[in-house]
Design a protein with these regions (language model features):
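Redox- and metal-dependent alpha/beta enzyme cores, enriched for Fe-S-associated oxidoreductases
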Residues: 209-248
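Active-site glycine-rich loop that binds ribose-phosphate moieties when present
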Residues: 168-187
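Short internal beta-strands
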Residues: 29-33, 224-231, 267-273
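Short Gly/Thr/Asp-enriched flexible loops that form oxyanion-binding sites at enzyme active sites
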Residues: 16-20, 204-217, 279, 283
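Electropositive, gly/pro-rich neighborhoods at or near active sites that engage anionic ligands
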Residues: 32-172
């Protein structure tokens, strides 16, 4: 079975670990979000790609869900002693090595997709991890801080400001001019199932869909497309997805996120059992819906979510 997954960071990575447990023999291609990418200290940092790579490769800080296990921060402390910022983004020593290798390879002329493949040679994540594009795309958020309206990088909004001010707009800068990375459209065309994990629908999955040709390829793939709600009981399972949903005019409910994706894209949608009351609303929107437990409390819970998603895909296929 060929499965394509559009993934952001922590939620996407943990779902993928469950998917690998549920169907160990499946051929899984992950299209990773690069809208979170940021340049720090002259290095290109790809938080979502790295979170997927580290999680599936066994090097993730399990407690945080991001960054490396057994991490130290000597380099960060030395940079701070020189007054070199920013100090709000916690890059560890082991993590720095990844970004140095990536930046060196990009400087030598390799595209991000080839660099990501090379990095995965070390981590052996057991999936094919492709960035959504080799072009530079950065998600920016329009905010008002101290009476001044300005655009900040998504990482600054998320990490430094902790989404403490309303997001007035969310824009994937550069997306309109970008092209899907090599292998992205081919993977979608060859897929048996396409899954949207419980990643952020605006700044993770939404950014991938903003790359010209990706949304159209998924809509026209002719195979089941099933998503899992990142909203449980009208609140994000983790993170601050409600803040960026508000910026695009979507209420923070499982049903509203399904409607945001739309029946032209989604065939099936899983909501948590606490949101069973919204199943009818989703089905009225033309999307087959089931209520199942959606809390990834451990690996088996994530694996069961993946099984439910694949079961719904087969239900859609047989309809």
């Amino acid at each position: 079975m060929r499965i394509v997954v559009l993934a952001g960071g922590i939620g996407g990575a943990r779902f993928l670990r469950g998917l690998k447990q549920a169907v160990p023999d499946a051929d899984v291609t992950v299209i990773g979000n690069t809208g979170d990418d940021i340049h720090l200290f002259g290095l290109k940092v790809c938080p979502d790609l790295d979170t997927v790579m580290y999680t599936l490769g066994g090097g993730i800080n399990e407690e945080q869900g991001w960054g490396r296990a057994d991490e130290t921060f000597h380099l960060k402390e030395e940079l701070a002693a020189y007054g070199a910022g920013p100090d709000w983004f916690g890059l560890g020593d082991r993590d720095f090595a990844t970004h140095i290798v990536r930046t060196q390879m990009l400087g030598a002329g390799y595209p991000l997709s080839a660099v990501t493949e090379a990095l995965c040679d070390r981590w052996k994540p057991g999936v094919r991890l492709i960035p959504m594009t080799d072009d530079r795309v950065e998600t920016h958020v329009a905010v008002e801080v101290d009476g001044e309206r300005k655009a900040v990088h998504f990482q600054e909004y998320w990490v430094r400001l902790r989404a403490s001010v309303p997001a007035e707009a969310v824009v994937p800068v550069g997306a309109e001019q970008s092209k899907p990375a090599p292998g992205v459209l081919e993977a979608i065309a060859e897929a048996d199932v396409i899954l949207f994990p419980p990643s952020n629908p605006v700044v993770s999955v939404g950014t991938i869909l903003a790359v010209p040709g990706v949304r159209e390829a998924i809509a026209g793939a002719g195979v089941p497309v099933v998503g899992l709600s990142p909203i449980v009981g009208d609140a994000p399972v983790r993170g601050m997805a409600d803040k960026v949903l508000a910026a695009v005019g979507v209420e923070s409910t499982a049903a509203a996120v399904a409607e945001h994706y739309g029946s032209g894209l989604l065939d099936g949608w899983l909501v948590d059992t606490v949101d069973a009351g919204s199943v009818a609303r989703v089905e009225e929107a033309g999307i087959r819906c089931r209520a199942v437990p959606l809390m990834m409390t451990d690996l088996e819970a994530a694996a069961q979510m993946a099984r439910e998603a694949l079961a719904l895909a087969e239900e859609v296929r047989g309809a």
